[in-house]
């Protein structure tokens, strides 16, 4: 609420906000293909209007259209993939069914249609990876995250892009498990490329929200790597990372929004020394930055450790040396994560502050309270990762053909 105190037409803003939340929740609760696709599209509509009417005035129309076109293109490939799945299942069972439970039972047994299933895998992955903003399908994300109102940036980076990863696991990993192992290395490699691309681009940014947006691209690369290795430990870590990233990145966008609200600046080069002026915000930003960088004992460390462990388990299970090389390269990307997070924190909060920021003071309690809650949760899931792992792991272990936790 504090972030929108100066927004025009707040009732309409919050109505769209709730509609957006409903779409994301419906995606996770959908039980058939049509229901899932409707929910997937519902996420798009309120987000478009939130950007169009409450985004940065100079660029919001162009940014909203870019978001619409990219996500609609992804939706088309998903729709084609769903149609092909429905056709294959109807041929196999003799009846048209869109129920995911039935599809999940029938599709893994279609051993005579592996080539077609691989085509479906690629079509669905293309649509879901647009939502995840994986390189090279990420171009919509930096301007949208940077120019959307802070509450929407928090949900876009902390929740909406995660729905793409959730869908990848639900369809590509579970339903299409019979071909997932054949394509796993290429998916993992795309994840590693995304890690490095997003990290390098984040290092080059001066706009505080755009830096965090490219960081989200990099972090989705971690998740895609974990999905790609197709091991219990990797997929468990990837799903856990959705939780840790939602907490950590949501926290960082809240901190960035508070800084922009108090200083009226977005250029981190014009900031500095804000830890003296905004100590609660600085503490919360430190927690979020350390978690994204993979520092113990925070949630980001626990989830990243599991994801990288999954890469080595893939090598142990398959004897495929490229998995070993890819895992080592993936681990080295932590250097980039630490670098851009260190640059973010030191440039904004440490050192002397410019004279024109002399009158800056701490953000309102309506902002600092929400930051504190997310910071505490980030610490709790880091110290007690079993809170998430013990829920996720048993569900991952039943995926057909997945490589075991060794």
Task: Walk through the language-model features, giving the residues of each.
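Cytoplasmic/organellar membrane-interface segments at the starts of transmembrane helices
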Residues: 148, 275-281, 341-406
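Short phosphate-coordinating micro-motif centered on Lys-Gly-acidic
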Residues: 41
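Hydrophobic transmembrane alpha-helices and their helix-loop junctions in integral membrane proteins
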Residues: 1-7, 11, 20-36, 46-347
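Central hydrophobic cores of alpha-helical transmembrane segments
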Residues: 16-17
